[in-house]
Amino acid sequence: ATPCYAWALIPNHFHLLIRTGLVPVATVMRRLLTGHAIRFNHRHQRSGHLFQNRYKSILCQEDPYFLELVRYIHLNPIRAGLVADLHSLDRYAYSGHSRVMGKLKGDFQDIKTVLSMFGETRREARKRYNAFVFKGFLAGKRPELTGGGLIRSSGGWHAIKEFRRMGAHFKSDERLLG
């Protein structure tokens, strides 16, 4: 099994936070995207590709970036203008936030792991998780979260600038989270 900790469906893309396991990410994504395309095409009596480009992935070490990714992914529907606020997000069917908050059910998402990082009981954990997400909502875009996996895994912008000063060059995907 491939645990999913956070997800959000947006009209033109989606986000998943999954743990790699015995099955490579490429295989998981191929199965997911192909299966979805087949079902979608059948339901809408159409054929062809649904997605324009290959998926993008970044490597995430669990501490501390894991929780930042959970928050970023679950706030995506607000940033995309699909819901107005956190109260609406609590019941938004196309994001894992509603499952973590216990407002909607779904057995494919591992909410226990996420909640365990916020408290001993589900009630306490949900309260602290919601406060954490709200804090991210209030913060808006955060410059310290700029950059793809390379920047975070290399020790941040300071380390990257030092590497560049020494003449090192990297290929990376720059992204803004926040």
What function would you assign to each model-found segment?
Residues 1-11, 19-178:
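Short Pro-Cys-Gly-centered "Cys-loop" motif that presents a nucleophilic cysteine in a tight turn
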